[in-house]
Amino acid sequence: MLVLINTIQEQASEAIKQATDIVALEQIRVDFLGKKGKLTELLKGLANLSAEEKPKVGQLVNQAKQGISALIETKMIELKEKQLLAKLAAEQIDVTLPGRNHSTGSLHPVTQVKHRINDYFSRLGFDIVEGPEIETEFYNFEALNIPGHHPARAMHDTFYFGDGRLLRTHTSPVQIRTMEQRKPPFRLIAPGRVYRCDSDVTHTPMFHQVEGLLIDKQATLAGLKGLLQDFFSYFFGRELALRFRPSYFPFTEPSAEVDIECTQCNGKGCRSCKFTGWLEVLGCGMVHPNVLIAVNIDPNEYHGWAFGMGMDRLAMLYYGIDDLRMLFENDLTFLRQF
């Protein structure tokens, strides 16, 4: 019996050494240790042995099972390591291969213009403030001295909600809210989206505007003129002639519209400026006393000036774009130029 047990152990050991994969190794386990395996059959034959032989033979068979199990476990670890290494070798990535190209994005031309404007005015100590795009009639009209019969308050010019609120038509409400919260003197600009019922080559229902405001005891129209002259020279990178034309805005008095020398023809006259040599770029003026009174600022002590200009318009002039709608069509071929 001892010889038979040793023979089975040797057979199992040799078979385990020859196993080349996990499936073959599992079959060896079944052949020697399974329900019908060779060692299991020996245990079944213990019933035919004498009472003295049973314990000895049973102990030897169990030792053989433990030895074979240990060999199988060791071989299993070895085969799994080889299998993993083979898989890694098959899936190896060549890090020297060139990577896949990804197109890089860029800032939208209007965003670039906004950054240039913010950079200029922040250097002069202006705060950059923002406010809600859904406004009340008080902040959008009444506090700005725009009466109920003014055309700007008509349905065909302003987007109204059912509850009487509206999409702001300018960023002036931001200035009103700021004046309510702060004590003068202060200076600020308010860039943001605004909305009006208009759509053509030079107008869109949504556009970008930036407005500036300064409240101080020494604010003058001459100071505003000098600031705007310096700003446009900075923005376009060269000296430009400015022209102030008398105008009317409910929230400023006196009011003016500002033209700059045409950037396309240097004031000589072309299609862009309709052969006038001038391009209209903004409206401005001294803050109306009624606006100051609406926010509890004494107009006898403080004065202010304000201006407003379209950032989309400036982007068109700066980059030579002739159709405003191109800025909003999300054409990557067009936008990648900037």
Curated annotation (Swiss-Prot):
PROSITE patterns: AA_TRNA_LIGASE_II. It catalyses: tRNA(Phe) + L-phenylalanine + ATP = L-phenylalanyl-tRNA(Phe) + AMP + diphosphate + H(+). Mg(2+) binds at E253. It holds the Pfam family tRNA-synt_2d. InterPro entries: aa-tRNA-synth_II (IPR006195), aa-tRNA-synth_II/BPL/LPL (IPR045864), Phe-tRNA-synth_IIc_asu (IPR004529), Phe-tRNA_ligase_II_N (IPR004188), Phe_tRNA_ligase_alpha1_bac (IPR022911), Phenylalanyl-tRNA_Synthase (IPR002319), tRNA-bd_arm (IPR010978). One of its GO terms (cellular component) is cytoplasm. SUPFAM superfamilies: Class II aaRS and biotin synthetases, tRNA-binding arm. Gene3D superfamilies: Bira Bifunctional Protein, Domain 2. It comes from the Bacteria. Its EC number is 6.1.1.20. GO terms for molecular function: ATP binding; magnesium ion binding; phenylalanine-tRNA ligase activity; tRNA binding. One of its GO terms (biological process) is phenylalanyl-tRNA aminoacylation. Binds 2 magnesium ions per tetramer. It is found in: Cytoplasm. Tetramer of two alpha and two beta subunits. NCBIfam families: pheS. Belongs to the class-II aminoacyl-tRNA synthetase family. Phe-tRNA synthetase alpha subunit type 1 subfamily. This is Phenylalanine--tRNA ligase alpha subunit.
